């Protein structure tokens, strides 16, 4: 994780506001006007009291009461508009950030996401992004409002006596800057530790739910629950510490405000006693300071409340700014069709662990190429390289007599269908799960693909047929049924090159025969690379290649 200062995180998050600058300016102006209205309600009360006791200070009682009534009326409207603008900005930007994060994950996938903690990713996508609402709705405009309010009130108090203006400035600096800086140092790492622990807890819970059958089978439920409670307690302790700091912040802020008011009262009283300041002006200056701490108090609270938000922002920025292993290829000469593939002297390693070494293979058009080998020999890795999910360390891979690095990514995806060993299913109907491979596919096309995958009859036996929901991760289906949905996707995609990784490993011999027959029939206008351990599956191959220790043998 890249370590950024809070200022750097703040600057990068503010840049995202640019498309909504108009709404942000409206929120600041409405907020400024609203706070001024609230403050001058009290100040006008002071003018009215002074007029009532015969010490006219420039505004009569009648005028003060009329203006105060108008300010009270408009205060509610201004506050509503300010909050509406702030939350419109916040929710629009949260949607934009989610879109950017999903685009970044798509760009990083699969090379940077293989082995990544999925629970932590879910935590970033959900709760971390949601925490940014505090920054966009309750931080940017309040900071600007506090800055502008400080200037206005210093000028107003200072016009009675410049010495009182200096006292007001010192009070605002203490409450709005010194206290947040002091408190933020005390809770410096709390926010990041809380977000990290929350992500780890989310991952632990997700793993526990997915592995629930194994946990129950091996009687690990109690042990797993104890670990979950331990992690939860540790997270709660961290949150309690942050809340304790927030409590200190509130107490310190209140004490400084009380001290500032007292000093202002004493200074104004002393000047009044010495005859350098009129009593009415002294009273108005004290009232003005006492009623003006609202905006800067909001700044004081940021020292503790923003630690979680900045930590969340840092985690979100990690995803947005992470560089992908593979960049999409665009703007190259189109590759209209698949005319064969070739790998020459390819080397590839996963994090310095050699997988393929001097690997070469030719894949002629309209043939079925079988690939066999022990687990870990590099068979599946070769298919991923053909999909350009990874970059080779050495050697070349050609598609249609072009280097794979020069083929437009859209052309490559159109020409290739890839079925992995584990079929990922979504909590949706069978129809929509198959349609993933071709979003505009007709129902007839989906049914034909399912027939080729020996899935059609099974689907019709279900109460809701093709509209049957498969459950989360396809947990209502057997391994073989999930695998056949993956095959149906590959058939529906109708690509020139089919890359099938163990397509029949979970199937009985009857379903295997139906699928192999369908693949053989597809051979006239398709090329198939078939990875399997089964000798029966390899019978349809025109050529069988053996991979051993990352080499052809």
Predicted regions located by residue number:
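Membrane-integrated ABC transporters
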Residues: 1-37, 58-63, 82, 86, ...
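Short intracellular "coupling" helices and adjacent cytoplasmic loop segments at the cytosolic face
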Residues: 2-4, 85, 91, 99-123, ...
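An intracellular "coupling" helix at the cytosolic face of ABC transporter transmembrane type-1 domains
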Residues: 14-22, 107-111, 127-136, 140, ...
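Transmembrane helices of ABC transporter permease
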Residues: 19, 23-34, 71, 138-193, ...
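Transmembrane helix-loop-helix hairpins at lipid-water interfaces of multipass membrane proteins
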Residues: 21-78, 160-163, 276-279
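Helix-loop-helix
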Residues: 51-66, 156-170, 248-314, 319-320
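Cytoplasmic coupling helices
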Residues: 84-103, 144-145, 168-213, 220, ...
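ABC-type nucleotide-binding domain
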Residues: 336-553
């Amino acid at each position: 994780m890249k370590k950024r200062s809070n200022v750097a995180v703040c600057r990068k998050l503010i840049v995202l506001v640019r498309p909504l600058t108009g709404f942000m300016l409206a929120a600041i102006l409405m907020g400024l006007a609203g706070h001024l209205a609230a403050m001058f309600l009290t100040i006008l009360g002071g003018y009215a009291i002074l007029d009532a006791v015969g010490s006219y200070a420039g505004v009569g009682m009648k005028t003060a009461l009329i203006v105060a009534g108008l300010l009270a009326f408009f205060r509610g409207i201004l506050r509503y508009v300010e909050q509406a603008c702030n939350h419109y900005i916040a929710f629009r930007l949260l949607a934009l950030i989610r879109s950017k994060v999903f685009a970044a994950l798509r760009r990083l996938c699969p090379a940077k996401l293989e082995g990544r903690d999925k629970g932590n990713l879910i935590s970033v996508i959900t709760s971390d992004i949601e925490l940014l609402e505090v920054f966009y709705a309750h931080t940017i405009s309040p900071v600007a409002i506090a800055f502008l309010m400080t200037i206005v009130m210093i000028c107003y108090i200072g016009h009675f006596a410049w010495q009182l203006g200096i006292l007001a400035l010192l009070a605002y600096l203490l409450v709005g800057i010194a206290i947040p800086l002091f408190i933020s140092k005390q809770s410096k790492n709390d926010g990041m530790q809380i977000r990290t622990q929350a992500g780890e807890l989310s991952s632990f819970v997700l793993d526990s739910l997915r592995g629930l059958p194994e946990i129950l089978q091996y009687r690990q439920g109690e042990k797993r629950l104890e670990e979950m409670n331990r992690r939860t307690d540790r997270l709660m302790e961290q949150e309690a510490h942050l809340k304790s700091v927030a409590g200190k912040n509130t107490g310190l802020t209140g004490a400084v405000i009380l001290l500032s008011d007292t000093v202002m009262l004493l200074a104004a009283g002393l000047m009044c006693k010495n005859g350098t300041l009129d009593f009415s002006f002294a009273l108005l200056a004290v009232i003005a300071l006492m009623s003006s701490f609202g905006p800067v108090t909001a700044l004081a609270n940021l020292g503790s409340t923003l630690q979680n938000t900045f930590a969340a922002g840092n985690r979100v920025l990690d995803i947005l700014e992470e560089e992908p292993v593979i960049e999409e290829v665009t703007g190259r000469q189109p590759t209209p069709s698949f005319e064969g593939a070739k790998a020459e002297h390819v080397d590839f390693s996963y994090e310095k662990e050699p997988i393929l070494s001097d690997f070469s293979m030719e894949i002629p058009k309209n043939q079925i190429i079988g690939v066999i080998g022990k687990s870990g020999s590099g068979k599946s890795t070769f298919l991923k390289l053909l999909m350009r999910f990874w970059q080779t360390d050495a050697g070349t891979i050609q598609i249609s007599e072009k280097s794979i690095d020069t083929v437009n990514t859209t052309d490559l995806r159109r020409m290739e269908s890839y079925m992995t060993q584990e079929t990922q299913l979504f909590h949706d109907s069978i129809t929509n799960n198959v349609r993933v491979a071709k979003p505009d596919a007709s129902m007839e096309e989906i049914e034909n693909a399912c027939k080729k995958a020996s899935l059609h009859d099974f689907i019709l036996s279900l109460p809701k047929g093709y509209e049957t929901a498969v459950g989360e991760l396809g947990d209502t289906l057997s391994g073989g049924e999930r695998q056949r949905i993956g095959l149906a996707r590959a058939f529906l995609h109708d690509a020139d090159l089919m890359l099938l990784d163990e397509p029949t490993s979970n199937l009985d011999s009857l379903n295997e025969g139906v699928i192999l027959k369908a693949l053989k029939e597809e051979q006239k206008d398709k090329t198939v690379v078939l990875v399997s351990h089964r000798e029966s599956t390899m019978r349809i191959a025109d050529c069988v290649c053996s991979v051993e220790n990352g080499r052809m043998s």
